[in-house]
C-alpha cells in the first residue's frame, strides 16, 4: 500500500514542527518546501536523523522547487511573513497575498487533488485567496484557526478548573482575529456547560469573561513574549489533527475556516465553523444556533473578514 505524501509549504518554525509531528504520528512521507534553498533540506535531514531515535519510518525530503510536491495527498501552507510585536494579522495582507499567489500556482500545477490546509495569516482572507489562486474545490481546502483558538480556550479552562484538558470541550467560531467568538454556552467540562459551572461556584462570570478575552488575544500574547515571531507548536499540532482526520477518515468535528455557501447566512467566504473532516474533505458543516448576543458577535466577526477580503481585492484586482 502506497504511503501518504504530505507537502509542507514553508520550512519555518511551524513547518519544521509539522514535519516532526507528521513523522511521530506516522501520517506519511514528508516533503518540506521553502524558497530559501538549504533550509528545507537541512530541516528534513535533521528530522530524518531523529527518526531512528523516535522509531518512525517516514521518508523526508527538502526542496525549493514546487515539482517536489507532485501528487501530495495533503498540502499544509505556512509560507508567509509571521506577525511581529505591534503588528495585527491584517497588516500582513500585502506581503502574504503575493505568497499565496505563488503557492496557489504551485498547488494547481503539481497537487490539484490534495486536501489543503492554510495556516498563513490573516487566515480567513488568505485561505479565500489561496482557493482562488489554486482552483482547489472548496470542500478540499480549509483554514487552521478554530482548532488552535479552541485549544487555547481549553487550556485556560483546564488551568482554572484544575481538570484534565481531555475533559474540556470548547468551541471558538468566527474569524481568526480579535473578533473571534468563543462560545461559552457550547463549551463544557465533562459535558457540563460552563454557564452551569458558574452557577455551581466553580468559577465566576468575571473570570470566564477574562478567559474569553485572553483567548481572543492568545496569539498576540505569544507574539509579545517571543518578540521575534509567533506561535508554532500549538498551530502545528492543530493542523496535524486536521490532516489526520482527513488521511484516516476519522470524521472528527473540528472548528475550521471553511467555505460557506449559505450556512450561517454567509455565502462565498471562509469562516470558522464546526465541520466534519473525513476522506472527502469537508463532509458536513454543523450549524449551531446562536442567541442574540452570540449572533451579534458572529456577525461582527464576519464583517471583519469581509473587510479583509475587500482589502485583498484592492491589492490584487484579479481577485475582484
Swiss-Prot record:
EC numbers, comma separated: 1.1.1.37
Annotated NAD(+) binding sites: 10-15, 34, 96, 119-121
BP GO annotations: lactate metabolic process; tricarboxylic acid cycle
Record key words, sorted: NAD, Oxidoreductase, Tricarboxylic acid cycle
Molecular functions per Gene Ontology: L-lactate dehydrogenase activity; L-malate dehydrogenase (NAD+) activity
Leader sequence residues: none
Function: Catalyzes the reversible oxidation of malate to oxaloacetate.
Lineage: Bacteria, Pseudomonadati, Pseudomonadota, Alphaproteobacteria, Hyphomicrobiales
Enzyme class, spelled out: oxidoreductase
Protein residues bound to substrate: 83, 89, 121, 152
InterPro entries xrefs: L-lactate/malate_DH, Lactate/malate_DH_C, Lactate/malate_DH_N, Lactate_DH/Glyco_Ohase_4_C, Malate_DH_type3, NAD(P)-bd_dom_sf
Catalytic residues (positions): 176
Name used for this protein in its record: Malate dehydrogenase
Family classification: Belongs to the LDH/MDH superfamily. MDH type 3 family.
Gene3D superfamilies recorded: Lactate dehydrogenase/glycoside hydrolase, family 4, C-terminal (3.90.110.10), NAD(P)-binding Rossmann-like Domain (3.40.50.720)
NCBIfam families named among the record's database cross-references: MalateDH_bact, PRK06223.1
Organism superkingdom: Bacteria
Reaction catalyzed: (S)-malate + NAD(+) = oxaloacetate + NADH + H(+)
Amino acid at each position: 500500500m502506497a504511503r501518504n505524501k504530505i507537502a509542507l509549504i514553508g520550512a519555518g518554525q511551524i513547518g519544521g514542527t509539522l514535519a516532526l509531528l507528521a513523522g511521530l504520528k506516522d501520517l506519511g512521507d514528508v516533503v518540506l518546501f521553502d524558497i530559501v534553498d538549504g533550509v528545507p533540506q537541512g530541516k528534513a535531514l535533521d528530522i530524518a536523523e531523529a527518526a531512528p531515535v523516535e522509531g518512525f519510518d517516514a521518508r523526508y525530503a527538502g526542496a525549493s522547487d514546487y515539482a517536489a510536491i507532485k501528487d501530495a495527498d495533503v498540502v499544509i501552507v505556512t509560507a508567509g511573513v509571521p506577525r511581529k510585536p505591534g503588528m495585527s494579522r491584517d497588516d500582513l495582507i500585502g506581503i502574504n497575498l503575493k505568497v499565496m499567489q505563488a503557492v496557489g500556482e504551485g498547488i494547481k500545477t503539481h497537487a490539484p487533488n490534495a486536501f489543503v490546509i492554510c495556516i498563513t495569516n490573516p487566515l480567513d482572507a488568505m485561505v479565500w485567496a489561496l482557493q482562488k489562486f489554486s482552483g482547489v474545490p472548496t470542500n478540499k481546502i480549509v483554514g487552521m484557526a478554530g482548532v488552535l483558538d479552541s485549544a487555547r480556550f481549553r487550556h485556560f479552562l483546564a488551568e482554572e478548573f484544575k481538570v484534565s484538558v481531555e475533559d474540556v470541550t470548547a468551541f471558538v467560531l468566527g474569524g481568526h482575529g480579535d473578533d473571534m467568538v468563543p462560545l461559552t454556552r457550547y463549551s463544557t467540562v465533562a459535558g457540563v456547560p460552563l454557564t452551569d459551572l458558574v452557577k455551581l461556584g466553580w468559577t465566576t462570570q468575571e473570570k470566564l469573561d477574562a478567559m474569553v478575552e485572553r483567548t481572543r488575544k492568545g496569539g498576540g500574547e505569544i507574539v509579545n513574549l517571543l518578540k521575534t515571531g509567533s506561535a508554532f507548536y500549538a498551530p502545528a499540532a492543530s493542523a496535524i489533527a486536521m490532516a489526520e482526520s482527513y488521511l484516516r477518515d476519522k470524521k472528527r468535528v473540528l472548528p475550521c475556516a471553511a467555505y460557506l455557501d449559505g450556512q450561517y447566512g454567509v455565502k462565498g467566504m471562509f469562516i470558522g465553523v464546526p465541520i466534519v473532516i473525513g476522506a472527502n474533505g469537508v463532509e458536513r458543516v454543523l450549524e449551531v444556533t446562536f442567541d442574540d448576543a452570540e449572533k451579534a458577535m458572529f456577525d461582527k466577526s464576519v464583517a471583519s473578514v469581509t473587510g479583509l477580503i475587500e482589502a485583498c481585492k484592492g491589492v490584487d484586482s484579479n481577485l475582484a
